[in-house]
């Protein structure tokens, strides 16, 4: 019994192996509301998920799922919680576009079954710069007691004159 106690204490005091979270590689990603962009030989797929889920691939057959979303929990902009009571970290339906040498990513903040929602915007100079996303704020918001529409499902459109527009659904 004395030996067991010494071994148990030694195991508890031994340093634990610490490793960074490894990306998961899959050949068939199952996602909601995907959007894909291509930059410098790599495909970037963004989709509904906690902090905006992100995957990368060089061949569109083998996808590496990032262990954390584009926005980590601590990086979710404060305005999202102010605009959408009850919103946490589950971000919906991103859309991404390159416009004038910059990437823009629009996303929806909402709670299921409500039409108090908001569409936010992030910008970055490169999709490969995972720490370079800058919050550009809220583009549009809907309020359940005010509006009969819902600010979700953003989509960028560039017209024939090169002017950018944002459409959204619901």
Regions found by a protein language model. Name each.
Residues 1-21:
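Bacterial Sec-dependent N-terminal signal peptides
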């Amino acid at each position: 019994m004395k030996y067991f106690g010494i071994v148990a204490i030694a195991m508890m005091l031994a340093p634990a192996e610490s490793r960074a979270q490894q990306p998961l590689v899959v050949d068939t990603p199952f996602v909601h509301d995907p959007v894909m962009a291509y930059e410098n030989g790599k495909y970037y797929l963004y989709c509904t998920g906690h902090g905006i889920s992100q995957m990368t691939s060089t061949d569109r057959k083998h996808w590496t799922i990032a262990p954390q979303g584009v926005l980590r929990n601590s990086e979710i902009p404060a305005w999202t919680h102010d605009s959408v009571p009850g919103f946490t970290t589950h971000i919906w339906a991103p859309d991404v576009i390159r416009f004038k040498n910059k990437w823009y990513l629009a996303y929806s903040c909402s709670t299921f079954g409500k039409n108090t929602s908001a569409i936010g915007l992030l910008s970055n100079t490169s999709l490969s710069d995972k720490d370079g996303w800058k919050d550009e704020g809220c583009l549009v918001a809907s309020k359940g007691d005010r509006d009969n529409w819902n600010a979700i499902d953003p989509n960028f459109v560039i017209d024939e004159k090169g002017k950018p527009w944002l459409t959204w659904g619901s």
